[in-house]
Amino acid sequence: PDFTLRQCFFGEHLLTDKTTTKTIAIVESEKTAIVATHFISDFVWLATGGMNGCFNKDAVEVLRGKEVVLVPDLGAADKWKSKLPLLQSICKQVLVSNILEDNATDEQKTKGLDIADFLLMTETPQMALQRLIKRHPPLQHLIDSLGLVLVEEP
């Protein structure tokens, strides 16, 4: 066939406006980029199309001179951090967000949730408790010492 296949970011067409000053947020799945755009419009949301997708020299060229934040799925942060040297050579600024890893429960980490999963989810009592324990670590000692259990409303 007479064509050349070129991998690109999902949402890359949104970068054609040269006047945009929004930071670019990159996620793994197309669904996540769409959901995040709805909830967090301060960023231009792009998707790689997979954990390893679009992290090559040609594909990332569209990010030249841009401020970029990578928002990997739970469990993928180290893999995405390995892409920093490539991106740092092209982007004005790039960082990997730890917001999911820092706030997820062990169960959520095991499931490998992404930011869309959190944006679409209603906070459960277990999630609220984990958030409080993260903020106030002595709370866990108190819970353990007194044998407290989480009681959910019927």
Functional labels for PLM-detected ranges:
Residues 53-61, 79-80, 104-116:
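Short, charged, surface-exposed secondary-structure boundary motifs
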Residues 1-66:
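Phosphate-handling DNA/RNA-contact segment within nucleic-acid enzymes
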Residues 31, 51-55, 72-83:
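Acidic, metal-coordinating catalytic cores used for nucleic-acid/nucleotide bond scission
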Residues 106-149:
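Short, small/acidic-rich helices and loops at N termini and domain boundaries
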Residues 24-26, 63-79, 98:
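Acidic beta-strand-to-loop metal/phosphate-binding motif
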Residues 41-45, 85-98:
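Structural alpha-beta junctions
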